[in-house]
Amino acid sequence: MAHCMESALLLLLLLGSASFTDGNRCVDAAEACTADERCQQLRSEYVARCLGRAAPGGRPGPGGCVRSRCRRALRRFFARGPPALTHALLFCGCEGSACAERRRQTFAPACAFSGPGLVPPSCLEPLERCERSRLCRPRLLAFQASCAPAPGSRDRCPEEGGPRCLRVYAGLIGTVVTPNYLDNVSARVAPWCGCAASGNRREECEAFRKLFTRNPCLDGAIQAFDSLQPSVLQDQTAGCCFPRVSWLYALTALALQALL
Ligand SMILES: *[C@@H]1O[C@H](CO)[C@@H](O)[C@H](O)[C@H]1NC(C)=O
């Protein structure tokens, strides 16, 4: 309720100003999630589980992060949260680095994504762990089937199209191949791993990494989602706030009349 009033006020303040159109979409997405009870509850759960850094061996790290619990909470967020809202958080389009940094931090990467060491392992390591995992393996196969370009082509994408690719990508978050944005100046994504130290299996390693980084099907799906995002979020928040705008308008008008 208080939040709705705040949003409505903010809306009044911003209407007609140029900043309204080029605002931070990741902030918009976070606000839309906050306004939805289920999204907000699931997000609070993973934030509480994912604070702090991961430590080796599944012990709680500094700040109490147990990676397996954090990842389970993230999987629940995507499995049970409203996709329009969870996907808006995950795929919000950014122009500046402040927005991109926020997007990179969305899923508490110190616990869910990187570490516990300082140097990322070879990508063959998470790949092999995923292939041995009953949870991860089908999700990775679905990601390959729905997001990888056709063999021998760089940009012929699976026919089911972008929305399915985004859904299965989101399904990888919280597995041993959890991907994230790599920096705050691009939209490149990958699991936390590299291919420098992969010896004679370099090609296999690069092939896995290319599923994520500069994959034209995944990048295209993210861009297509982003071009629809403002209308998606408006639909989500409309039920919450827009009716209040009218009486706030009336109140503002009355207050102005009193002043004049
Ligand atoms: C972007 O990332 C760099 C390197 O990690 C960091 O130094 C910088 O503070 C980040 N920018 C923002 C706006 O957070």
UniProtKB/Swiss-Prot annotation:
Q: Name one GO biological process term.
A: glial cell-derived neurotrophic factor receptor signaling pathway
- Propeptide found at 238-260
Top-level taxon: Eukaryota
What is the reported tissue distribution? Expressed in many tissues including adrenal medulla, brain neurons, with highest levels in the cerebral cortex and hippocampus. Moderate levels found in the gut circular muscle and myenteric ganglia as well as in other peripheral ganglia, including the sensory dorsal root and trigeminal as well as superior cervical and sympathetic chain ganglia. Isoform a1, isoform a2, isoform b1 and isoform b2 are exclusively found in the thyroid, parthyroid and pituitary glands.
> Is Ligase given among the entry's keywords?
no
Query: Which spans are transmembrane here?
Result: none
Keyword list (alphabetical) reads: Cell membrane, Glycoprotein, GPI-anchor, Lipoprotein, Membrane, Receptor, Secreted, Signal
User: What is one term from the GO cellular component aspect held by the record?
Assistant: plasma membrane
Q: Which residues form the signal peptide?
A: 1-23
Q: Which GO terms describe its molecular function?
A: coreceptor activity; glial cell-derived neurotrophic factor receptor activity
In the UniProt record, which residues carry a glycan? 184
Glycoprotein listed as a keyword: yes
**InterPro entries named among the record's database cross-references:** GDNF/GAS1, GDNF_alpha, GDNF_rcpt
Q: Where is the lipid attached (GPI-anchor amidated threonine)?
A: 237
Q: Which SUPFAM superfamilies match?
A: GDNF receptor-like
Its function?
A: Receptor for persephin (PSPN), a growth factor that exhibits neurotrophic activity on mesencephalic dopaminergic and motor neurons. Acts by binding to its coreceptor, GFRA4, leading to autophosphorylation and activation of the RET receptor. May be important in C-cell development and, in the postnatal development of the adrenal medulla.
Family (UniProt) = Belongs to the GDNFR family.
Assembly and binders: Interacts with ARTN ligand and RET: forms a 2:2:2 ternary complex composed of ARTN ligand, GFRA3 and RET receptor. Interacts with SORL1.
Entry protein name: GDNF family receptor alpha-4
Query: Which species does the entry assign this protein to?
Result: Mus musculus (Mouse)
